[in-house]
């Protein structure tokens, strides 16, 4: 559930003890892992309305979040999520999240595979199958690709040698 607290100031005498704007701002994280920084570079080469900066990245356990630059330090507070889930760090690799795919436009990421809605491979993608996409082999780089239908993102796939390994969220797949 959600909880709310009302804080009430007792007197004006203690106000001289506070300096600044009263908000403790987040300190930059330690160095971002290489596998994550490569992915962030691809995001920043797209046409995002903003740049993803390392100071706005928060890593909790293995989950990577993009936080608002205005968000204060949350040290000591229990939070479910601290921003947009970018993905997860797993065994020396980064896997982007479905939430990130849904938050992007096709022009926001550099490696995009977009098919028309009437292509039979769209249904295969929605069912979680691996796709053969030989026509994208020369103009798409290997690695994480944003899979789109008519320019609208559906999810992620890992592209290599003309094959797209489906990373569509398992709970969303067609039966």
Q: Can you annotate each of these PLM segments?
A:
Residues 2-12:
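Conserved beta strand-loop-helix elements of the APE1-like EEP
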Residues 10-175:
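Polybasic, low-complexity RNA-engagement segments
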């Amino acid at each position: 559930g959600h909880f709310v607290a009302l804080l009430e100031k007792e007197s004006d005498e203690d106000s001289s003890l506070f300096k600044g704007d009263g908000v403790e701002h987040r300190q930059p994280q330690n160095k971002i892992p290489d596998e994550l920084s490569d992915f962030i570079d691809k995001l920043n080469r797209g046409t995002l309305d903003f740049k993803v900066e390392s100071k706005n990245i928060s890593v909790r356990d293995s989950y990577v979040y993009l936080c608002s630059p205005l968000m204060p330090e949350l040290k000591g507070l229990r939070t479910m999520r601290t921003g947009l889930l970018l993905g997860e760090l797993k065994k020396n690799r980064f896997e982007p999240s479905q939430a990130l795919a849904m938050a992007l436009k096709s022009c926001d990421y550099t490696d995009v595979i977009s098919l028309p809605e009437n292509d039979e491979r769209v249904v295969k993608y929605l069912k979680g199958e691996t796709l053969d996409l030989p026509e994208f082999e020369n103009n798409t780089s290997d690695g994480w690709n944003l899979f789109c239908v008519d320019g609208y993102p559906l999810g992620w796939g890992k592209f290599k040698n003309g094959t797209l390994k489906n990373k569509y969220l398992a709970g969303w797949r067609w039966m």
